[in-house]
Amino acid sequence: MGLELPLILGTSSVFRREQMERLGIAFQAASPDFDETPMLGESAPQTALRLAEGKARSLAGRFPEALIVGADQVAWCDGRQWGKPMNLANAQKMLMHLSGREIEFYSAVVLLNTVTGRMQRHIDKTVVVMRKLDELHILRYLEREPDAVYCSCALKSEALGALLIERIESTDPNALIGLPVFRLVDFLKNEGVDVL
């Protein structure tokens, strides 16, 4: 590869930063300035992809010669989108409602080359079947995993949240954490970045 462009991860998510760090690829994290409000009539995959693209594009002015990763995740259950509870009370209500249900997580990742304008896109669908939960189990989980309030559906699957799950169907287990790593590696290779 000729010119090596810096890799920018457009996120304020500590979980996505941790995923990138585990890959051992040099990158810089930057918080995108982008309105993440869902649009009326938008499907969960459409929302996830629009937000991932918007995050990447919002950083293009700050990083005019870079590869920018944008990612977002939207959960779908019972005919509606679910986000992050952001506090304990919301997390308890959310987990009680989702107990025993099937949730679809749509994790979008994009890679924007700000020099060429090329944007690669992918949406990964992960189906999660939750165990039947009672209030005591939910309280214990949230006491032991306080960061879960910052996860989609309060489900920190890479840690104790795994105990709440009965089954997962996915082509990329990383996607449920928030970043479809398998596809991102392909995107980076397409840009001439050797990840190993």
UniProtKB/Swiss-Prot annotation:
Keywords, alphabetical: Cytoplasm, Hydrolase, Nucleotide metabolism
UniProt-recorded Gene Ontology molecular function terms: nucleoside triphosphate diphosphatase activity
Database matches in CDD domains: Maf
EC identifiers of the protein: 3.6.1.-
Active-site residues, Swiss-Prot/TrEMBL: D72
Pfam family for this entry, one: Maf
Locations listed in the record: Cytoplasm
GO process terms (BP): nucleotide metabolic process
Cofactor(s) the protein needs: a divalent metal cation
Keyword match Hydrolase: yes
Role description: Nucleoside triphosphate pyrophosphatase that hydrolyzes 7-methyl-GTP (m(7)GTP). May have a dual role in cell division arrest and in preventing the incorporation of modified nucleotides into cellular nucleic acids.
Identification of the protein by name: 7-methyl-GTP pyrophosphatase
Source organism (scientific name): Neisseria meningitidis serogroup A / serotype 4A (strain DSM 15465 / Z2491)
Taxonomic path: Bacteria, Pseudomonadati, Pseudomonadota, Betaproteobacteria, Neisseriales
